[in-house]
Amino acid sequence: MKVRTLTAIIALIVFLPVLLKGGLILMLFSYLLAFIALKELLNMNMIKFLSIPGIISALGILIIMLPQDAGSWVNDLQLKSLIAMSFILLSYTVLSKNRFSFMDAAFCLMSIAYVGIGFMYLYETRSEGLHYILFAFLVVWLTDTGAYIFGRLMGKHKLWPVISPNKTVEGFVGGLICSLIVPLVMMIFVDFNIALWLLLIITIILSMFGQLGDLVESGFKRHFGVKDSGRILPGHGGILDRFDSFMFVLPLLNILLIQI
């Protein structure tokens, strides 16, 4: 418990100033987190980061996370690069004599999209305004807290025992309820330029998908037979273990709240 608490304190000391500062430093930090998360994901599937598929995947992350405001050429480059990488990875299945399979190629492409899009929206959301990124983090944290408390106090019905045996329906609902505290409080101090009832609906959707993101990452770990995605955060596991909910919440937040 002491190790877990100490890790959380150190992580906050490092991450919070970067998040508040935003800009280039957050973008570079997001890239760092994305590369670590990609390595964790590839390791689950026994694909080495410093291998041809690993390097191609890292290049995909590099391209897919390019700032969207850099120009229209970015989207064109991203599309053409993903097409090229698909052909290269599929060709490598033949060159490796199926030691690298078609499923591995699909896994690499999925990893690029899953990790790259999630962490791209970490700095993209911050660039839209500090209140948006704080909103996302608070929704996820209140959801996790509510799910834990309600699950411990009232949890009787398993939510998805095959994937995550400890999660309950009561915890899931409790997470949704607690997440609503965020818009109710933030609307007092921040103008989201949206009606409160609509923001409450968006919050519920974000809370639901945040919990789904947690389950998806749990599904990865259970499928590959690992307890944690990594060991870079003592007591907490890996980067994916800490950011799994955000992989779903941040892109969805941009679609539902920022871009409407």
UniProtKB/Swiss-Prot annotation:
Pathway recorded for this protein: Phospholipid metabolism; CDP-diacylglycerol biosynthesis; CDP-diacylglycerol from sn-glycerol 3-phosphate: step 3/3
Known catalytic reactions: a 1,2-diacyl-sn-glycero-3-phosphate + CTP + H(+) = a CDP-1,2-diacyl-sn-glycerol + diphosphate
GO cellular component, one term: plasma membrane
Coiled-coil portions: none
Pfam families in the cross-refs: CTP_transf_1 (PF01148)
Ranges that cross the membrane: 9-29, 46-66, 70-90, 102-122, 130-150, 172-192, 196-216
Topology versus the membrane: Multi-pass membrane protein
The entry's keywords: Cell membrane, Lipid biosynthesis, Lipid metabolism, Membrane, Nucleotidyltransferase, Phospholipid biosynthesis, Phospholipid metabolism, Transferase, Transmembrane, Transmembrane helix
Enzyme class of the recorded protein, top EC level: transferase
Biological processes per GO annotation: CDP-diacylglycerol biosynthetic process
Chief subcellular location: membrane
Similarity comment: Belongs to the CDS family.
Name of this protein: Phosphatidate cytidylyltransferase
Lineage: Bacteria, Bacillati, Bacillota, Bacilli, Bacillales
Gene name tied to this protein: cdsA
